Amino acid sequence: MTNPLWFDPNLCLIGGEWKMPVSGQTLPLVNPSDGSEICQIARGGQTDIDAAVRAARSACDGDWGRMTALERGRILTRLGQLVLDRVDDLAQLEAMDVGKPLTQARADAVALARYCEFYGGAADKVMGETIPYLDGYTVYTLREPHGVTGHIVPWNYPMQIIGRSVGAALAMGNACLLKPAEEACLTALAFAHLAIQAGLPLGALNVVPGLGAEAGAALSAHPGVDHISFTGSVATGALVQQAAGRNVVPVTLELGGKSPQLVFEDADLDAALPYLVNAGIQNAGQTCSASSRILVQRGVYDAVKSRMATAYQELTVGPAVQDLRVGPLISTRQKEIVTGFLHQGSDLAIAAEGQIAAGAPESGAYVRPTLFSDVPPDHALARDEIFGPVQVLIPFDTEEQALTIANSTEYGLVASVWTRDGGRQMRLAKGLRSGQVFINNYGAGGGVELPFGGVGKSGHGREKGFEALYGFSQLKTVAAYHG
């Protein structure tokens, strides 16, 4: 793959200006497909975060803060078109940066454009309401921006998460400070270039790359930030919330998951199979909403196991540019984590494994997709988030048992139910402790319009859909006495 960079990657965007971090320091960005260095990126720190917060506040008090919702929406709509115009360039950046197969990376770029379109159209559709009250009063509510919003974005889906987080915040009139992951920040920088081209006022979007322990920690604890959105690990999310809490700053957290799919004996197995497998191996399993637990009723357990095993045996892992179904993990460190979990499964039966492509660089972060069978629900592989292409098959006998197993982890992000029984569909939709429940599908095609978020250690707050616009705004009540 030729280097698709069309911009200088080692700069921060602060107040509409691209500049080196104050320290002058940079960090290497590594291609997980072969371990080579792509480029150097800025190593922003406390001073850069301070400057970006001031720039964002100035935007809130200036042209951006005075702009109408209609005008904001038009900018986002233009931005969506600019993203579509460069969708192949963005896909190449993401494939090189994250190791994501080109087809999946391109789908993420299209999703980013869709977020811009959706929130561009929704910007002037968020309304207050009038409230009947005492005689002589007129009471109504207003939706207003928080002000300066911080966005700490992970490495697994940079474009999609920027779209659902930054896109919604901009639609509501907030000025954003984006801290992309140090492992994958190229599409975040590209997005910022396109946002300027779309006409976004200076300071409305600021981008400070850097280490989480430096730039991320400074952003989380900054007293000038009015709201923080974080997507990432449970441990880091807890630290972000703790730091923000000292300034009484609200936080939206989208954290880990151990999402189950429940397959009943009356399920359409032909329809279910692609979802059962793909939900576990997409993006090499590095997805918060990955379905790593497949719960199967005993009457169809052997059939599901056989079909999934066949599908796994056909999986090949290779460099992003080869555009296979599975690419590398993000880093050798992540490979070590996933390999450690595979070792913990040495007491389990392996139903099937995928293969690593011949000629794949040994320096790439590759692991074989692995399907374990007959896994006890309390086993570490059935309980802990792995964040790799690993799935476990768990048999069950009754609906009640399936629900108990599904709800037995600390997480609650996504769940899926495969059954033709309408009553069972409704019972489980209510009974599953999960932010999203899908019936006879998984993920509903990505669903820009569908509110997304978790319960338990999967986090709190909602992004995507109109619900995100409420989260990135605050409600003001006005009570006017006129006699």
What are these regions (language model features)?
Residues 1-41, 74-78, 126-152, 252, ...:
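Terminal low-complexity tails and localization/encapsulation signals of metabolic enzymes
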Residues 28, 42, 65, 98, ...:
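A structural signal for short, well-ordered beta-strand elements
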Residues 36-39, 225, 262, 316, ...:
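Conserved C-terminal structural/oligomerization subdomain of aldehyde/semialdehyde dehydrogenase
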Residues 36-126:
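Glycine-rich loop-to-alpha-helix module at the N-terminal edge of alpha/beta enzyme cores
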Residues 227, 235-376, 439:
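ALDH superfamily catalytic-core signature
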